[in-house]
Amino acid sequence: MSINSNLGGLSHRNMILSDKRILEEIDKGHIIIEPFKRECLGTNSYDVHLGKHLATYRSRVLDAKVHNEIDGFEIPKEGFVLQPNTLYLGVTMEYTETHAHVPFLEGKSSTGRLGIDIHATAGKGDVGFCNTWTLEISCAQPVRIYAGMPIGQLIYFVVEGEIETMYNTKANAKYNNPTTRPVESMMWKNKF
């Protein structure tokens, strides 16, 4: 099935990659997903799963100008019950690299129907992002979650124009250190 390259004035360059195109970009090394499972590839997205590590902030009152420390823990085999009014930091099982496209992480509809939000505002990645994804998890009511459950989906947009500085080469990039654990806010590193 082909899509008209000019839909409603939008250039084909502003479109989301299809399943076939995602596979082509993986073959070229422009997109890396580890581990990659073919059955997780959707029509125009790739399903990602909740890793085994969660964290919560030590303080109930967070301060944007200071380093807010977190306490990490593993999700037990019997699952973990999320509570409303608590921000949990989670992490994807999948490590990803994106060298030519803008990745967006969105929750799966089945996750949303359980009342779970997987990101507060940080759904967009940058070209050159090479890491697992930290999730900002909250819930509408108590809900039990499990390591390995499908939690979100990555979609990829084509970038128009040449990239001057990839995220993984930016001197001031705050989330470049590879990790399999959630990473707390680094807002305190900004000058304001």
Where in this protein do the model-derived segments appear?
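DUTPase catalytic domain/fold
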Residues: 2-192
